[in-house]
Amino acid sequence: MRIALLTESAFPTARSVEGGWCDRLTRGLPEHEFELYALGATRRDPMPEPRPARLAALHHSGGTGGLSGLPAGGRFGGGLHGPRRRRALAAYRALVGALVQPAGADGFGPALYALADAGRGGGLPALLRSGAALDIVEAAWRTPGARGTVGPGSVGEPLVRDALVAVDLLERCLRPLSAPWYGPDALAAADVCHAVDGGLAVLPGLLAKHDHGTPLIITEHSLHLRERARGYRDAPYRWPVRALLLAFFRLLAREGYQQAGLITPGSAYDRRWQIHCGADPAAIRVVYEGTEVADRPGAGAEPPVPTLAWSGPIAPHGGLGTMLRAFADLRRELPEAVLRIHGEAPAGAGGYAERCRELAALIAPKDPDAVVFEDPSAEPGAVHRQAGVVVFCGTGGTAPRVLAEAMLSGRPVVATDVGAAREVVGPTGLLVPAEDPRALTAACAALLGDQERRSRLGNAGRLRAQELYAVEPAATAFRALYLELVSGWPGPDPVRQAGAAPAARQPFGRPADYWVAAGSRQARARDSVPVEAGAG
């Protein structure tokens, strides 16, 4: 089969998280042909080195700006005029209405496809940044009951600058509609579209399914909608803008879940979130993210002194403050204990990181080696080898793969009972409530004071992670899922090259459901009318 991998990022390398997953998938399924479509890549970007294995082709999004800069030239240039412009503005008006009106959510999908259809041939990004688009957003916010315009005082009152920001951000979100991927030699020729980690990467898959009937599978190792919602907590936008963008990603996720033939979350915890967001439980298959660390040896002998290794982002949701308070109490029981901190401060968290360093210096002022801040670029495995217990105490939940790689070191894990931690760690580690320094102190002291228990839990955790997160079971699962998806899907129409003779009919070349669905496809083509196509 020809598999189109869709990603929101730039071209991933084989060493990056996303590229590493693509590399493992393509190596594990040598019988298939894979092509990578990267929304964040432009024609100026160099090919990744090392590139993921067995990728037949890598496709950029066109222009020079990808998803992060202004497009220029190619399909992005030009303008929309006459009936196409009126159709595009009518579709955009319906799309924005679906975002701001709670009762209009069902109109999101039809408006999205109508907008993409009206923008064929170029000019859509320029129109979506125009004054006409600005007028549509401002008018939508003025309608009674518009989402995001209700709040205490002036919190929900949209300003002109809010409309300017919203139009710009929404245009960037809709830029995949103009990617040069929808011709007969690209997504139309794929047997399956596989969107990696959801989000905007789903948009090309939705259009390929809508236009060509290409089946879609969505893989989310961390729920994209949930991460977006967390990210917008500290975003520098006022409430009307945040509400509009969150509504877009929520409705995009719902449309993707409803149109996908199969959905593969990385944990049962994410599966529950997906069902809550509109996914059909029958379409969901949990596939744990494989990691090559499963084939490597464990960490070996423990350090001579009782040592904890903390991992996570040095930010309020990472839990380092809780860890330091717990470690201060632990030092009263184990004065020789050492804490090794491995993480870096994300953008905007520099002040928090500095306060954590000041607090760490107060824990043992006469012993500067009691708390060690590791180089953020150090390999996690190297940090695990220097500890007897690995601790994750963030409030936002640690990625299952990160927990699994810590367990694969053979060290016992202490983690806060949030997210997928209970599912991943199971009975092989200790779970504590979030933001509870006393419980964290007790768990760490219990393990550091019992070498036999540390060894038993560490070995059990390694075996559990090897069973769940080995590479081969993940590849085997996708081999079966691709076959399951294609076997139950009507085949696409054959792509005919210009000037070529019609292909001869192949007996039994298509399943019976293709011919049954052909009539309904023709009926939909006759009945489909673009939103307000005759307006103006």
Model-derived regions, located:
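Conserved acidic donor-binding segment of nucleotide-sugar-dependent glycosyltransferases
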Residues: 430-437, 446-452
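A short, well-ordered alpha-helix in the C-terminal region of glycosyltransferases
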Residues: 439, 453-468, 474-483, 494-497
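N-terminal subdomain of nucleotide-sugar transferases
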Residues: 1-152, 489-536
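Nucleotide-activated donor-binding/catalytic signature segment of Leloir-type glycosyltransferases, i.e.
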Residues: 353-377
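Aromatic "clamp/platform" in nucleotide-sugar-dependent glycosyltransferases that forms part
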Residues: 395
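Short hydrophobic beta-strand element within catalytic cores of glycosyltransferases
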Residues: 412-415
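Donor nucleotide-sugar binding/catalytic pocket of nucleotide-sugar-dependent glycosyltransferases
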Residues: 142, 147-153, 157-176, 243-297
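Conserved donor-binding/catalytic core segment of Leloir-type glycosyltransferases
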Residues: 293-331, 340-342
